[in-house]
Regions:
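Ribonuclease/tRNase effector modules and their secretory precursors
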Residues: 1-93
Length: 93
């Protein structure tokens, strides 16, 4: 389901996030925060929470049948506020 290699593992780990946490945040009722095209590739930033309670932004793209995580990092205050507003007030971007 997920596509990992040396490059995206390095980017995720540089932010102190494990691949398992990134996957978990995506799968646990994540919210699409914004979308953009980078070098002809459609990317979506998702805000989500791990089972341990960590709030992450996960930027990913669909490649065939797999999801490729580009990077993942902890939500900042503004992103966390937006996450709660969208999640609990139904105001999605």
């Amino acid at each position: 389901m997920f596509d990992w290699d040396r490059n995206n593992l390095r980017k995720v780990r540089a932010h102190g996030v494990t691949p398992e946490e990134a996957e978990e945040a995506l799968l646990n009722e994540s919210i699409s925060a914004y979308e953009q095209d980078v070098d002809g590739e459609h990317r979506v930033a998702y805000y989500g929470q791990t089972s341990a309670g960590r709030f992450l932004a996960v930027v990913a793209t669909q490649r065939g049948e797999k999801i490729r995580v580009i990077t993942a990092y902890d939500l900042n205050r503004r992103q966390l506020r937006d996450y709660f507003r969208w999640r609990f007030e139904g105001k999605n971007a």
